[in-house]
Amino acid sequence: MSIKRRIYLAAPLHDEADQARNHKLACALRAEGYEVYLPQEHGKWEDLVSKFGGKDVTRRYLYNMDLHAMQRADCCVAYMDREKGPSEGMLWEMGYMSGCNKPVFLLNPGFKWGYNLMPEFGSMCFDTAESLLCHLNEEDFIGSEVQV
């Protein structure tokens, strides 16, 4: 790949299983040559609160870091767990990226139409990581928009 594309990876981070899955997906994308921003890689919440001296300061710092990463990214890859449903943060990130006219690719194993209108029509949906990677590697998605 000649251009190192930047991907913002939006996904739930509620528990260790989510974080392990997110890490695995980020590694797969990086192995294909993409630069991946994964919010959970900031570090542990307790360590960050200690570093910045409080919860409010830490929350503002994380928000600004994530917002800056979305602005720099060429696209968003979002993961939606059908069993747990989407996270509010992930949906916000998808909407922000879509509003910036950046492509949003939704990885939703077991995807079925009719689950949620906005994520489905505001993104390109994939049901396997392999199909997502194949599409990313074949498409020149920089500057493209999702067609409805």
Model-flagged regions — what are they?
Residues 1-148:
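Conserved catalytic or regulatory cores that recognize and/or transform ribose-phosphate-containing ligands
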